[in-house]
Design a protein with these regions (language model features):
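Conserved, carboxylate-rich catalytic/transport cores that coordinate ions
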Residues: 9
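Divalent metal-dependent phosphate-bond-processing catalytic cores, especially two-metal-ion Mg2+/Mn2+ enzymes
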Residues: 2-6, 16-196
Length: 196
């Protein structure tokens, strides 16, 4: 015990600023300062991920398999909605995600608190914002050229299982195969497609 247990309830709510499981306006906090802490935490989490020099490879090699296993890439509803057909499809939608979701959070929902970080950097320019732009520009080039092989970085994977990343991909591929086997076969002819 370190004597901070009274903060547990509020911290348990503040941590939701880093996720998407709740709408931000559903996070109930009594003190305005707690909302500011939530904005700072949410901003730090989002900016650190987007600025990571291996962000694109992590989306491809880790986030997509996690989305598959979590039922996000292939929706678990009866209609089997497919949001991301592949890791490349996820990356192809990342620019839109940044514009419509991440940037909206940073600029509006989190009240641009990333500006406070700028005071710590030379000439007030945040390397995080610079690296986010660099990642998104590079991704746009990869998409335009269709050259996914340019994503060559292999970020370290710190998990107890030395084959953890490989195992994650195997599980995700099995989930996709299971889903595919349940889908109706495409019609073999135009007559079959029209029900004749």
């Amino acid at each position: 015990r370190i004597g901070l247990e009274q903060f547990v309830p509020v911290v348990a709510r503040i941590v939701h600023f880093t996720g998407y499981e709740l709408k931000l306006d559903q996070i109930e906090l009594e003190q305005p300062k707690d909302s500011v802490v939530g904005h700072l935490l949410g901003t730090a989490d989002l900016v650190a991920q987007l600025a990571d020099r291996c962000y694109l490879e992590k989306c491809r090699d880790r986030l997509y398999p996690e989305f598959v296993l979590g039922g996000i890439a292939i929706d678990e509803r009866a209609d089997g909605t497919v949001l991301y057909r592949s890791a490349e499809d996820l990356l192809g939608k990342t620019l839109s995600f940044y514009q419509t979701s991440a940037r909206m959070r940073l600029e509006n929902n989190f009240n641009r608190v990333y500006r406070y970080f700028e005071a710590f950097f030379e000439r007030g320019r945040s390397p995080y914002i610079r690296f986010i732009r660099k990642n998104l520009t590079f991704l746009n080039t990869v998409i335009q050229n269709g050259d996914w092989n340019r994503l060559r970085r292999h970020p370290p994977c710190v998990v107890p299982d030395p084959r953890g990343e490989e195992h994650l991909m195997e599980l995700a591929l099995q989930r996709v195969r299971d889903w595919s086997s349940k889908q109706p076969a495409p019609p073999r002819s135009l007559a079959e497609a029209s029900g004749l």
